[in-house]
Amino acid sequence: MHGYRTYNMESHHAHHDASPVDQKPLVVDLLATQYGKPQTPPPSPNECLSSPDNSLNGSRGSEIPADPSVRRYRTAFTRDQLGRLEKEFYKENYVSRPRRCELAAQLNLPESTIKVWFQNRRMKDKRQRIAVAWPYAAVYSDPAFAASILQAAANSVGMPYPPYAPAAAAAAAAAAAVATNPMMATGMPPMGMPQMPTMQMPGHSGHAGHPSPYGQYRYTPYHIPARPAPPHPAGPHMHHPHMMGSSATGSSYSAGAAGLLGALPSATCYTGLGVGVPKTQTPPLDLQSSSSPHSSTLSLSPVGSDHAKVFDRSPVAQSAPSVPAPAPLTTTSPLPAPGLLMPSAKRPASDMSPPPTTTVIAEPKPKLFKPYKTEA
């Protein structure tokens, strides 16, 4: 056998008078201790009495394993034991040795096990406290880390803004295009101009497309200057369509432009034509109704009679050389237009409106649109 050695009595062959019992060989077990079954020592000598599971291992309780790396089994606590230990922990985190002995006697647990449980419970409590207060502790201890946290928070808050940025940019681009290139605005009154109010109105009218309150603060800067800005393109918008189309189309374009822009200069210009009320919406309706008699009297003019600002454009078809000089002046005074008596008769109604604003706006515009007058 591998782990056994047989010893025979040397005197067996020498002394033949030995008893038959001496003739039997003696077998000694020389198996190393590390090959034996690992024995789990109790944490304390009282373990054998406290735990019923170890009652069968009572004989092995006094044995100590030769290998110190052998790990003992994990202690299983009952609900009653855990509840009692938790109550004691809430009363006092650090328990003295006499108190641990009392708990060991009450819970039928070894004193060393109770000591280890309190150590683990204190570490668990420490981890919980750190997990709850880690942002504040890190912010106060490390300024760089605090700056990174603030930057991340700012980036997360800025997320709602990008969807509104394209709309604001489009509104600004449309306003810039109309202001810089009035020629483009002639064909865009019904199409291009309404886009600017729709993008800028959510902040005030509260369209369903932009319910977020961020739209108000983002679009307000673009919406406020949009109202005073129309006076500059207002001249081309009111003049261009009438030069391009007939009297009926001119009146419809004027109604659309006045309704979309809602600028005061447009209302004041209409008052000089016989409209007493300086409202932004009512003049186009009155002018359309009153345009029929004027257009009948001035059948040769390509411009609707509702626009007396272009008074020199109606005679332009009849006499071309007289147009360039009196065109800007006719907006305020009806004297240069000998064929049109309507503005001169209804001039007292336009005294209340400020004429200098219309004169400054109308001066450069007719020069730009002379080709339209010649085509008409």
Swiss-Prot record:
GO terms for cellular component: nucleus. It comes from the Eukaryota. The keyword Lyase does not apply. One of its GO terms (molecular function) is DNA binding. Residues 47-60 have a biased composition (Polar residues). Residues 70-129 bind DNA. Residues 1-22, 34-67, 229-248, 281-376 are annotated as: Disordered. It is found in: Nucleus. Pfam families: Homeodomain (PF00046). PROSITE patterns: HOMEOBOX_1, HOMEOBOX_2. Residues 283-302, 314-334 have a biased composition (Low complexity). Residues 10-19 have a biased composition (Basic and acidic residues). InterPro entries: Even-skipped_HD, HD, HD_metazoa, Homeobox_CS, Homeodomain-like_sf. Its main location: nucleus. Coiled coil: none annotated. GO terms for biological process: adult heart development; blastoderm segmentation; cephalic furrow formation; germ-band extension; heart morphogenesis; motor neuron axon guidance; negative regulation of cardioblast cell fate specification; negative regulation of transcription by RNA polymerase II. Keywords: Developmental protein, DNA-binding, Homeobox, Nucleus, Pair-rule protein, Transcription, Transcription regulation. May play a role in determining neuronal identity. May be directly involved in specifying identity of individual neurons. Pair-rule protein required for segmentation; involved in transforming the broad, spatial, aperiodic expression patterns of the gap genes into a system of precise periodic expression patterns of the pair-rule and segmentary polarity genes. Belongs to the even-skipped homeobox family. This is Segmentation protein even-skipped. It comes from Drosophila melanogaster. The lineage of its organism: Eukaryota, Metazoa, Ecdysozoa, Arthropoda, Hexapoda.
